[in-house]
């Protein structure tokens, strides 16, 4: 199991997303999966489902 798979089920808070239609800063989401290239699949509290690219997007793992 790689480290990213251990993040499944964790809550994250978006800091900054580089996307044409980004998730707003401070939005909370739950990681529900990791795809083949390492993007984190997230269900956001605003109803959106948008992946996070760990090498590009800034986020914080919540306790």
What do the PLM-derived regions correspond to, one by one?
Residues 7-63:
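Basic/aromatic-rich interaction segments and small domains that mediate binding to polyanionic partners
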């Amino acid at each position: 199991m790689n480290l990213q798979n251990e993040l499944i089920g964790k809550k994250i808070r978006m800091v900054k997303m580089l996307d044409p239609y980004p998730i707003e800063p401070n939005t909370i989401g739950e990681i529900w999966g990791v795809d083949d290239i390492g993007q984190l699949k997230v269900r956001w509290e605003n109803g959106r489902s948008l992946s996070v690219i760990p090498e590009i997007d800034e986020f914080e793992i919540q306790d």
